[in-house]
């Protein structure tokens, strides 16, 4: 059995998967905000409960936001303060007496989708998250590509390309990102960015679902806004695809529920790619909230 943990700032979610990659059981508990011992105990108790339920010593994989293992072996995860700065993988491996694997939660999302029955035919899968921020991951032949610093797939911190400024205007505001840089694309392409763009052009503060509802009703402003957003997304994604050249792009996050993105994006990409480039298949993520647990569990399928 494969145990996958999706750990965030508010919850620890465990999913248990069998050899056919089917979800057999899941449970969620609150993430301890303080106290490393309490955090370790919460994870170990869930593992013990799963072991007892299935009468097996399952493998353990964990997806967590941040850098799973820094140079000194500690975790960096600002959203999980109880464990940040601690040697989480080593401590859990010792307590559970088994190999524990950690990876970035965005990599786990991409890995979950790459192991979907429909998508295993594709050697190089790119996961793209359009949610509160913009992120993602790359999976090659069923294995996540992490890079030396676990920042492979941090697409949101690429800067606006010159074609974006040609589209939006060279006086377009370069917003300061939380990372400290100017013009990171997640400030324009995330759910927050989608809403900010609308307010920037129409001086009306609306949230993404409200704008999408207006678009569905045929509102002219919302229609123009979506056209502009999709063109900007195509410009930025074109740069990424020129570097990565994936077979498949799977889009997750809140904006993935907006069908115009997955249905209209492919037609906008060719003019932003090399003439010989093939537009990859673009699909909406299949596994929703279970994706983080699935991908974490499948870290043990990558041997």
Curated annotation (Swiss-Prot):
Tell me the HAMAP family matching this sequence. GlcNAc_kinase (MF_01271)
Q: Where does ATP bind?
A: 4-11, 133-140
Entry's EC annotation = 2.7.1.59
Q: What does this protein do?
A: Catalyzes the phosphorylation of N-acetyl-D-glucosamine (GlcNAc) derived from cell-wall degradation, yielding GlcNAc-6-P.
Listed PROSITE patterns: ROK
Name the positions where Zn(2+) binds. 157, 177, 179, 184
- UniProt keyword terms in alphabetical order: ATP-binding, Carbohydrate metabolism, Kinase, Metal-binding, Nucleotide-binding, Transferase, Zinc
Cite the source lineage: Bacteria, Pseudomonadati, Pseudomonadota, Gammaproteobacteria, Enterobacterales
Q: Which GO terms describe its molecular function?
A: ATP binding; N-acetylglucosamine kinase activity; zinc ion binding
The cysteines joined by S-S bonds are none
Protein name (Swiss-Prot/TrEMBL): N-acetyl-D-glucosamine kinase
What is this enzyme's catalytic activity, as reactions?
N-acetyl-D-glucosamine + ATP = N-acetyl-D-glucosamine 6-phosphate + ADP + H(+)
Among Gene3D superfamilies, the record links this protein to: 3.30.420.40
Recorded hits in InterPro entries, A to Z, give:
ATPase_NBD, N-acetyl-D-glucosamine_kinase, ROK, ROK_cs
Q: In which pathway does it act?
A: Cell wall biogenesis; peptidoglycan recycling
* Entry's family note: Belongs to the ROK (NagC/XylR) family. NagK subfamily.
Task: Give start-end of the signal peptide.
Answer: none
What biological process terms from GO does the record include? N-acetylglucosamine metabolic process; peptidoglycan turnover
Which top EC class is named for this enzyme in its record? transferase
Q: What organism does the record attribute this protein to?
A: Citrobacter koseri (strain ATCC BAA-895 / CDC 4225-83 / SGSC4696)
User: Gene name?
Assistant: nagK
């Amino acid at each position: 059995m494969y145990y996958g943990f999706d750990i965030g700032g508010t919850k620890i979610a465990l999913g248990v998967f069998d050899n056919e990659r089917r979800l057999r059981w899941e449970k969620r508990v609150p993430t301890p905000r303080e106290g490393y011992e309490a955090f370790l105990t919460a994870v170990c108790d869930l593992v013990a409960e799963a072991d007892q339920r299935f009468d097996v010593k399952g493998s353990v994989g964990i997806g967590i936001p941040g850098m799973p293992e820094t140079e000194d072996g500690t975790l960096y995860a600002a959203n999980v303060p109880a464990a940040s700065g601690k040697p989480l993988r080593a401590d859990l491996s010792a307590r559970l007496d088994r190999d524990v694997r950690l990876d970035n939660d965005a990599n786990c999302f991409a890995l979950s989708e790459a192991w979907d029955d429909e998508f295993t035919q594709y050697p190089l899968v790119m996961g793209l998250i359009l949610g509160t921020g913009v992120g993602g991951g790359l999976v090659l032949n069923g294995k996540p590509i992490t890079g030396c610093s676990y920042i492979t797939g941090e697409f949101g911190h690429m800067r606006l390309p010159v074609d974006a400024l040609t589209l939006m205007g060279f006086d377009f505001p370069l917003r300061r990102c939380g990372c400290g840089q100017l013009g990171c694309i997640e400030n324009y392409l995330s759910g927050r960015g989608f809403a900010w763009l609308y307010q920037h052009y129409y001086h009306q503060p609306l949230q993404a679902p409200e704008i999408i509802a207006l678009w569905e009703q045929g509102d002219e402003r919302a229609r123009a806004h979506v056209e502009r957003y999709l063109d900007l997304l195509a410009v930025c994604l074109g740069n990424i695809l020129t570097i990565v050249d994936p077979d498949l792009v799977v889009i997750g996050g809140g904006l993935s529920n907006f069908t115009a993105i997955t249905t209209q994006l492919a037609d906008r990409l060719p003019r932003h790619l090399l003439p010989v480039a093939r537009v990859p298949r673009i699909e909406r993520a299949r596994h929703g909230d279970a994706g983080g647990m699935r991908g974490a569990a499948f870290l043990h399928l990558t041997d």
